Amino acid sequence: MSRLLHAEEWAEVKELGDHHRHPQPHHVPPLTPQPPATLQARDLPVYPAELSLLDSTDPRAWLTPTLQGLCTARAAQYLLHSPELGASEAAAPRDEADSQGELVRRSGCGGLSKSPGPVKVREQLCKLKGGVVVDELGCSRQRAPSSKQVNGVQKQRRLAANARERRRMHGLNHAFDQLRNVIPSFNNDKKLSKYETLQMAQIYINALSELLQTPNVGEQPPPPTASCKNDHHHLRTASSYEGGAGASAVAGAQPAPGGGPRPTPPGPCRTRFSGPASSGGYSVQLDALHFPAFEDRALTAMMAQKDLSPSLPGGILQPVQEDNSKTSPRSHRSDGEFSPHSHYSDSDEAS
């Protein structure tokens, strides 16, 4: 550790200087200031007094009173209050002062050294100022946590967006899996891609819609049964007799009470005669077993109107008169058409 110079040591240094300067009494050493009064008290170190003892070649020489114009107050405050320089930086000037005293004792020419240039002084000053600025920037970074908060908010938003996208993709994949299970895969072990799945679904939907629009595509209509053929044959025969009965009705025949349009026989067989059933008629299915006596019954009903239709030949009227007592009335039909109950007797109809 360095130590301060005593007054006795300063006296010795002064005597050595006077001895060397005796041939030139008019010459005054530039850097031999008198020790301040504060140095006499050994236990009271003062930084400005110590700085005045530094050599002009030392980088800290710009803090001497000769260079007080270059931010002396800031630099002195930095040296006095810096915690990092309390032990190391403060000890360096003392060591250098001791070495300077020894050099003065040996040679006595320490005052003739060259002073540092202004460029070097400015460089040292910039270094010190740069250190202060760096420290201030570090403090400002620590005091401004807003950037960290902003980064935290952005990170949370990014994580939330990633979670939403992950859920959306999971739902989309689940929907495609269900669609693959519905559409026909034709025993294909390979898993269809999303594009192929959509194409197959489109084709499948179009095929189903066409099938609904044309339900009987590729099916031949069933052939008509034998009963339907017999029905058409006998209905054509009845229509011919119906034309003759209509002519007689125009000549002056009055329709029997309860007459009405012919009932439409229900069933799988379709005919060209369609109309609502009368109140007195019965809607029954036509059967081929009823039609063998159809022509005789129709002829008998027509011949019963011999008085109303004199145009008919007389030879045909005799069998009609003989068989008239055995036949039942025409079930109140006036159009000469076959009635389903024409084969019943009067007793059956009355009951």
From Swiss-Prot:
This entry carries the following GO cellular component terms, namely: nucleus
Q: Name the CDD domains on file.
A: bHLH_TS_ATOH1 (cd19713)
Regions of compositional bias (Basic and acidic residues) in chain numbering? 332-351
Q: Does the entry feature the keyword Plastid, yes or no?
A: no
UniProt keyword annotation of Transcription regulation present: yes
Gene3D superfamilies (alphabetical): Helix-loop-helix DNA-binding domain
* Compositional bias of kind Low complexity: 247-256
Predominant cellular place of this UniProt entry's protein: nucleus
What GO molecular function annotations does the UniProt record carry, in alphabetical order?
chromatin DNA binding; DNA binding; DNA-binding transcription activator activity, RNA polymerase II-specific; protein dimerization activity; RNA polymerase II cis-regulatory region sequence-specific DNA binding; sequence-specific DNA binding
Its localization reads: Nucleus
Query: Region (Disordered) spans which residues?
Result: 16-39, 89-116, 244-278, 308-351
List this protein's GO terms for biological process.
auditory receptor cell fate determination; auditory receptor cell fate specification; axon guidance; brain development; cell differentiation; central nervous system neuron differentiation; cerebral cortex development; epithelial cell apoptotic process
Annotated tissue distribution = Developing nervous system, and in adult epithelial cells of the gastrointestinal tract.
Keywords, in A-Z order: Activator, Developmental protein, Differentiation, DNA-binding, Neurogenesis, Nucleus, Transcription, Transcription regulation
The UniProt subunit note reads as follows: Efficient DNA binding requires dimerization with another bHLH protein.
Q: What is the protein name stated in its UniProt record?
A: Transcription factor Atoh1
